[in-house]
Amino acid sequence: MHRNYISRLVVLLFLLLPLPMLAQEIVLKGRVSDPKGNALPGASIQIVSHAVSGNDRILGKATSGPDGLFVIKLDFPGNVNLTADAPGFRPVTRAISLRRGTNPQIEISMNELSPRLDSVSVTADVNELNVLTPDPAMRVFVRQDLLDANPGRPGAPVSIPGYPIETASSGIKAPQYFAPGVAGDHGEPIAQYIAVGAYLLPNNLSANAHGNGYSDPNIFIPEILESVQVDGGAFNVREGNHSVNLAATYGLRSHLDPFLTITGDYRDLDLVAGWSPSPDSFLAFEASYGNGFLDRLEHRQQYKFNAQRIFHVGEHRLTLFGIGYFGRSYVPGLVPIFAEDKNDNDYPNLGDTTDPRQKDQTHTALVAFNDVWQLSQSQQLQLSGFFRTYNLSLFSNFGSDLGLIRQSEFRTAAGGSANYVNKVAEYFSLLGGFDYEREAPRRDDLDSYGFLNRSDPGYYGPFTPVDGNNITIGSYTPYIAAEGALARYFRYYLGWRRDEINIDNEDLVTTPQNPNDSFQKWVSVNSPKATFSFLPKESWYLPLISLSFGQSFFTEDPRTGMGQGTGAGTPVAPGSPVATSHSYQLVASRTVRNTDFKVTLGHVTSSAELGKIDPDTGAQFDLGPSRLRFMTVAVRRNFRQGSLLATFSKADARDFDSGQPTPEAPRTIFDLLGTAQRLPWRLQARGEFEYVGTKPLGAGCEPNPNAECTGTPVKEFRGAVVRPFMNERLTAGINFLIASGYTGQTTESFYPQTVIQEAVGVRIPSYASVTLTYRFGRTSAP
């Protein structure tokens, strides 16, 4: 009996032994952040268990606190889904595996804004800036509130308010963004990036055959873009070559609902399809055909492929991104703006072009990755890289003594980046990193085909090699920055980057008039950055004020000896391979009665450029030191079912030596953007009016060749009206552009051996097109 009692007691103890383990609760901690990495309070978190029967069960709930943190305690381990939902963002769902005890902290980034969101950020809340995005002049534009710049046609994917986009021809030739007082015709002082995860992937092409710093926005399918961020360019250590006057960063969506879009008019047809194979991925394809709206038919073909996949592996968030693009077309070119000019008596009317032989062919392939490793709640390590191929063959006639020219190249570009972020405390965040980039244009050629034979306008004839180069530009860049609160009402940002640049130029064409100009040179560039901000109390009725300083640079085109100096008749000596600038910026912003106001004042001084290469003619000229002053005022008002954004800029850019205005730099820019989400008959509308004032174009025009040539102002009103049908499964829309003026305005000499210049540009046609979008799968109620 006694032995029986003991045996039962042993069995009972054995059965009770696992109970402490069973009683050990499961603790899941996490943090929710916005697209900038800032804490996102008020997000709703749910842990959902999926049963085979289809009856889902909510196991736990939590709400993120002011610091974005949340804690959920559960009873049972297993594979579940975590869902995060925050106002203004698309819900995020992630499959996780729970184990007993404390699980690794979950980092949730709400990267994709809700399609219902109707906000355009024009004021910089200094409290939201961080060590990765420190510029108080930064503006983030939500894709849903922007208009396609040219729906179904080539060019920039979106129109950015206050930053006109122009090109000196039509067709697939890549347009470039302009900034107040900046003649950024070929992207030289304006940087363009693609946000692959948290990696800033450069889209500029240094020493491009057509123009130094050339960037091609044609590679994007507009539907994959979530946002566009613009900043001053010179005030962030992460932004390097070509980030002088402006940096524009395209943000990508995390997924696409399955769709098919057809856009067309009486001359063009565009088809786009996209879907998401998994919640954190997308595939998109586009095919575009057409002739444009100018008299010279384009015979355009474009094919695009954009794809992205995001993986969550433990504490890693890995983003893979790829692009494939091919395009070709004829490119209607510059024509005289003022037809009454007597020099136009012999001008051949060839249909919106001076030379029907002008054409362009471009193809590129790109792969990139970004790995964000969350070491702890406050520490993060990023590893990134990319590889790209690019080809260009562009035939242009800009009226030089060379006539029709061909600018061609094939290049490879590759790069890598590593950076470490540690937010030690509110008063100190540390960023340290290293970037590497190598661009290798091969057969960077300039050839001449001579002048147009009017009796046989399709004849090209033999070409004459003018110049050819093999170029390698490599940079090794360490950088460091610190950011935080100095006191209750002040914040600071201090940064430094040092670029060690290796430039290797192999001259492939040597003649007595064009001696061999091969060289190899190392150049070191230091770029300090600093921003100090004042954050008053709301009750003080004072604006947020920030003062910034930054030094920036762009690498010069290393090709030299390509032409003669202007007027002197002797070759121009090679200049410095790097041009530097010093920028100062004052930003004041405040919100009054739900209306955001921002004023930005800027002052930029730039070094002289000797032997600068004209991207249109291949000729060399000296460009003296310059000074730019500008003021931009932005006002935004959000309404319940819409928004208004007005931007006005005045600028004055001049050559220090001569005091003359910088040719082709816009001095006045006005932009008004409006959206309306709910109109009668369930219509939705967006409209934008843009005005670019008369620009100085240089000297040489009649009747006084010594006076400043001027062009004409440009006025554009673009709009889109859409209506959903079939429970938002089908959307029909009309896009239109009402325009007057000429884009790409410059001066040109049409005939050889003449010094008289004429104001020329590309006529901007008005048009309308129809868009139909069909969405597959489940749809949400309106």
Can you annotate each of these PLM segments?
Residues H50-K61, V120-R153, P175-Q176, N204, ...:
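N-terminal periplasmic "start-of-domain" segments of outer-membrane beta-barrel proteins
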Residues A156-P202, G233:
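Extracytoplasmic beta-strand/coil segments of soluble accessory domains associated
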Residues A198-G232, Y250-G251:
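Short acidic/polar hinge/loop motifs at secondary-structure boundaries
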Residues N218, S227-S276, A287, F293-D295:
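Short strand-turn segments of transmembrane beta-barrel domains in outer membranes
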Residues T261-Y289, L294-L334, R357-Q380, V424, ...:
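Transmembrane beta-barrel wall of Gram-negative outer-membrane proteins
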Residues Q380-S396, S533-T555, G575-T632, R636-S649:
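Membrane-embedded beta-barrel scaffold of Gram-negative outer-membrane proteins
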Residues A485-Y492, E500-I501, D596-S607, F621-G700:
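Gram-negative outer-membrane beta-barrel transporters
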Residues P696-G698, R723-P782:
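C-terminal beta-signal and adjacent terminal beta-strands/loops
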